[in-house]
A protein has these predicted regions:
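Signal peptide processing junction and immediate N-terminal pro/mature segment
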Residues: 19-28
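Extended amphipathic alpha-helical interaction segments
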Residues: 143-226
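Bacterial N-terminal signal peptides that target proteins for export
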Residues: 1-9
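Secondary-structure edge/capping motif, primarily at the C-terminal ends of alpha-helices
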Residues: 101-108, 127, 131, 166-170, ...
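N-terminal Sec/ER secretory leader and immediately downstream segment
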Residues: 27-140
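Bacterial N-terminal signal peptides
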Residues: 9-17
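Short, charged, amphipathic alpha-helical segments
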Residues: 114-118, 138-139, 178-181, 203-208, ...
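A cross-kingdom marker for long, charged
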Residues: 224-279
Length: 279
């Protein structure tokens, strides 16, 4: 189960590959993307690519399936109608939309696939990797019509492969991490929401993952100083600490149902902050 949740970080969730860091504020909203490069094992190591920033979608889907039956209406949300104005929120929001897509697939909600696909294309274009998503999006829509869930999963895996190359071409480490983190926060909101409704000790093990939490805390601590002055960064940093206190205990006890509900409230508040423009 621990291995499943390590992939449930959604974290890079399809749109992450790392390269030398640049400031979130310094990146333009859209850039032309060259052809998808091949990522060798050596390049992955050099760029810091690992199981948190590029999880297998196939394993991720298995992790969500382990939480079935999914009370979809209780954990679903309205997708953002437009892209956030700032690039950091756009990256976080993109990861969250991917998590929404995984939820729709596991719940087999045909009507939710098209909104997810279109939102993902719009946001990927804003990040400068739209060319790597559009082709897969069309195929996802076609397969959704006939409820070809296995085919949709295959296209999502292809999306991960292509967008990984696109993000690497953009040479933007911070944005890659934020896409990953946005997916993790939305994934945490979904999983804790499910466990709040149908608690089990096995499911509670999904919350107690100090390695994952510490990984993201370390990543945001190294981001550009200007970003660290924002309310968004403070929220990311503080709420990771809050989740860790509830989920990870010295005696290794699992979170109680009350603590899972508290984690859900924290995750929801974080996602609300992501959706709120910086003042």
């Amino acid at each position: 189960m621990q291995r499943l949740f390590r992939h449930l970080t959604f974290a890079a969730l399809t749109l992450t590959a790392l390269a030398p860091a640049k400031s979130v504020a310094q990146k333009p909203a859209v850039r032309a993307v060259p052809a998808v490069p091949t990522i060798s094992a050596h390049m992955r190591e050099e760029l810091g690519i690992n199981e948190f920033t590029t999880p297998s979608i196939a394993v991720l889907l298995k992790a969500l399936i382990a939480l079935r039956p999914v009370p979809y209406d209780d954990v679903a949300r309205e997708l953002p109608a437009q892209n956030p104005a700032d690039r950091a929120r756009l990256a976080l929001s993109t990861g969250a939309v991917i998590a929404d897509g995984f939820l729709a697939i596991v719940a087999e909600k045909q009507s939710r696939i098209e909104p997810v696909a279109r939102a993902l294309v719009r946001q990927a274009k804003g990040l400068g990797v739209g060319e790597h998503v559009t082709r897969h999006s069309r195929s996802i829509l076609e397969k959704a019509v006939v409820k070809n869930w296995a085919g949709i999963q295959k296209e999502l895996i292809g999306t991960q492969r292509d967008v990984e190359g696109g993000m690497m071409a953009l040479r933007d480490e911070e944005i890659a991490h934020l896409v990953s983190l946005g997916g993790w926060w939305r994934g945490l909101e979904i999983s804790s929401g499910i466990l709040s409704k149908q608690y089990s000790e096995q499911g509670a093990t999904l919350m107690a993952q100090p390695v994952v939490i510490d990984y993201f805390a370390d990543r945001i601590s190294t981001m550009h100083p200007n970003f660290q002055k924002t309310k968004l960064w403070a929220g990311l940093n503080n709420k990771l600490t809050e989740v860790r206190k509830l989920a990870v205990k010295p005696d290794k006890a699992l979170p109680t149902v009350e603590e899972v509900r508290a984690i859900h409230a924290i995750a929801k508040a974080m996602n609300d902050l992501i959706a709120t423009p910086e003042e």
